[in-house]
Amino acid sequence: MIQIDALPAFNDNYIWLLQDATSRRCAVVDPGDARPVEAWLAAHPDWRLSDILVTHHHHDHVGGVAALKELSGARVLGPANEKIPARDLALEDGERVEVLGLVFEIFHVPGHTLGHIAYYHAAQTPLLFCGDTLFAAGCGRLFEGTPAQMHRSLARLAALPANTRVYCTHEYTLSNLRFALAVEPENQALRERFEEATRLRERDRITLPSEISLELSTNPFLRVSENSVKKKADQRSGQQNRTPEEVFAVLRAWKDQF
């Protein structure tokens, strides 16, 4: 049984900590800062950091990798097509890798960056570590990829089992939900999610992980084929957007300025 906890970092990052109590081994995902992980390891001296999983090359995801590698000797896994510090295993789309006894399939999900990957574990309750591709009620900015690339990447993730737990890397949920409500103000599921997320943040609790089913009902970037979303995108752009990719592009540009 793997326990997953969030280690807060910077202003709004989460470093996901996977723990196998039987072996006293742990793994972390996207440690942009080594200090939260170092503090946890210092408080748990009988545990060993065995693996560091990286989704993409941005500093707030890799800034702590080298120090943690030096401290623990952990294996560093990351995308083959990006420069990742101290990487031991370069991962391509479709490959499988075992971490703490869990087998993860690698998805290449370009958009936020061109080499971005996600880690997917198929199980009764599937797990998805998706970095800055799919957020709770949102998606990552397009720093390197195109709207078409990101739309395809999100469509791939949206097709995963509805109960897949989504572990993204930022506490952007309230901001994303405010934008989502601007797109679909009459979406009752969305209004309820905003109220729940607000209550959680008021108690200083995190809003993650999410689930694919929740994203399908409330994330505008996964709802670009819905008439309500297309209508709002058409109003925003002043023209008829003929394809879901075009609707997505309008939404992403709007969110960048929101």
Swiss-Prot record:
Which residues participate in Zn(2+) 2 binding?
A: D60, H61, D132, H170
Pathway(s): Secondary metabolite metabolism; methylglyoxal degradation; (R)-lactate from methylglyoxal: step 2/2
Molecular function terms from GO:
hydroxyacylglutathione hydrolase activity; metal ion binding
Q: Tell me the InterPro entries matching this sequence.
A: Clx_II_MBL, Glyoxalase_II_hydrolase, HAGH_C, Hydroxyacylglutathione_Hdrlase, Metallo-B-lactamas, RibonucZ/Hydroxyglut_hydro
- The EC number(s) given in the record are 3.1.2.6
Q: Gene3D superfamilies recorded for this chain?
A: Ribonuclease Z/Hydroxyacylglutathione hydrolase-like
Q: Which cofactor does it need?
A: Zn(2+)
Cofactor note text: Binds 2 Zn(2+) ions per subunit.
* UniProtKB keywords: Hydrolase, Metal-binding, Zinc
Q: Which residues are involved in binding Zn(2+) 1?
A: H56, H58, H112, D132
Question: What is the top-level taxon of the source organism?
Answer: Bacteria
Q: Which reactions is this enzyme annotated as catalysing?
A: an S-(2-hydroxyacyl)glutathione + H2O = a 2-hydroxy carboxylate + glutathione + H(+)
Short name of one Pfam family for this protein? Lactamase_B
Concerning SMART domains, the annotation shows: Lactamase_B
Q: Which GO terms describe its biological process?
A: methylglyoxal catabolic process to D-lactate via S-lactoyl-glutathione
List, alphabetically, the PANTHER family matched: HYDROXYACYLGLUTATHIONE HYDROLASE (PTHR43705), HYDROXYACYLGLUTATHIONE HYDROLASE GLOB (PTHR43705:SF1)
Q: What does this protein do?
A: Thiolesterase that catalyzes the hydrolysis of S-D-lactoyl-glutathione to form glutathione and D-lactic acid.
**What is its quaternary makeup?**
Monomer.
Q: Which HAMAP family does the record cross-reference, listed alphabetically?
A: Glyoxalase_2
Protein family (similarity comment): Belongs to the metallo-beta-lactamase superfamily. Glyoxalase II family.
The molecule here is called Hydroxyacylglutathione hydrolase
Query: Which species is listed as the source?
Result: Pseudomonas paraeruginosa (strain DSM 24068 / PA7)
Protein's gene: gloB
